[in-house]
Amino acid sequence: MAGHSKWSQIKRSKAVVDAKRGAVFTRLAREISVAARSGGDPNGNFQLRTAINKAKAARMPAANIERAIAKGSGHDQHGACQLEAIRYEGYGPGGVAVLIEALTDNRNRTAADLRLTFNKHGGKLGESGCVAYLFEQRSEVYLSAQSAQDGGKVSEDALLENLLELEADGYQLIDDGGAVVYGPFQALEGLQAGLRDQGWIIEGWEHCWRPLTTISQADQKSEDQCLQLLDALDELDDVHHISSNLES
């Protein structure tokens, strides 16, 4: 019985991992399909090229990637993709601003799911434009510690020297030894290409909404409520990316 119990536990654990991987693949496929609406050739479509690279980094099967491209470009048997990218905005506990990027084939369903989640966790889904002015669109490039020559972590001096040659306006060293490089919205492709040419190993890159300023909560309970809201929103199938001005 002990062996059976252990095997059951392993199967349950594997099922959880498989479910999480499946959810990631679903989100990535949606992102690829939406990007492919502007053209199915990644060589001439930076958004699609970025989405494909993210999918490959997550070890998404090539067949899944091809199906998502075909769906978005209208080359599969079901015709063009009906997904659309929509931005939603709202407030969390304590007035924290929340900006959500969703990929959906049903606006009403997505809005209802978001409203229910906000209400359940002490927040409120707002009108378009209610918090967007508190954020700006930015470029972020993630560097691997594997590209470093300084004991397994990115050398700050070497990075700073290299960034002077690129259209970067900031960076942050992270705990795993890597780094994040920041730049203007339009600089994303040039940043990742320039850093790669300089010998850095690129783990990923993306456009993100980042808060102009952050706010802190009055107590730990309020902060925990905000984090629970953000986690619950992130679990929704249609949610692609979440940004907030909660101080981390």
UniProtKB/Swiss-Prot annotation:
InterPro entries from the UniProt entry: Integrase-like_N, TACO1_YebC-like_2nd/3rd_dom, TACO1_YebC_N, Transcrip_reg_TACO1-like, Transcrip_reg_TACO1-like_dom3, YebC-like
GO terms of biological process kind: regulation of DNA-templated transcription
Domain of life of the organism encoding this protein: Bacteria
MF-aspect GO terms: DNA binding
Keywords: Cytoplasm, DNA-binding, Transcription, Transcription regulation
Classification via SUPFAM superfamilies: YebC-like
Cellular location(s): Cytoplasm
Gene Ontology cellular component list: cytosol
PANTHER family in UniProt: TRANSCRIPTIONAL REGULATORY PROTEIN YEBC-RELATED, TRANSLATIONAL ACTIVATOR OF CYTOCHROME C OXIDASE 1
Family recorded in the similarity comment: Belongs to the TACO1 family.
UniProt protein name: Probable transcriptional regulatory protein P9303_05381
Species this chain originates from: Prochlorococcus marinus (strain MIT 9303)
